[in-house]
Amino acid sequence: MKKMMMTAMMILVAALCCFAGTHTHTITLVSRVEKQDAQYVIRNAETGATGASVVYCTDEIARQDVGTSFDIIQCNDSNGINKVHFTVSATELQAKVGGKLYGTNGVQILMNGVACGSEVSFTRTTVGAVAAGTVVEGFEVIWPTNASLVDATYEACVVLTATSL
């Protein structure tokens, strides 16, 4: 009897771990940061959009996911010293059940595992040409899941802005 109860508890714990995981996937948010007359142009690798800032909305994320990982990848063609100031904002969060949308709150941007609120800024310096594919910074956007929306899929909207210094 005791052995059966322990086995049942182990199965229950394993099942809970499957649904409470912190699975994330990586999306290349920026493939190039190009300098043009003291301005930086960002190109979104997923959509091809360019500009001084780029908005990226994730695809639907499965209900057991609690966040999405992003990489900022910088590539400059010049041979000088380049300083780029990045600002990341998580501006919208929503959960979808069937055709209905529900707002969620508590969004956090994590840099190196530290929660920084819904907006974070940082500056990076590059000297000379930076090889394509060099990761300048990685970050996660996380938010709490709502127990009453157990069948929801979640979407996050992230804005990345780069300015020259």
Residue ranges and their predicted role:
Residues A20-L101, R124-L165:
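N-terminal small/polar-rich segments of proteins
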Residues K96-G117:
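A surface/secretory-pathway sequence property marking extracellular, secreted
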Residues M6-T7, T68:
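Short amphipathic alpha-helical "recognition" segments used for binding
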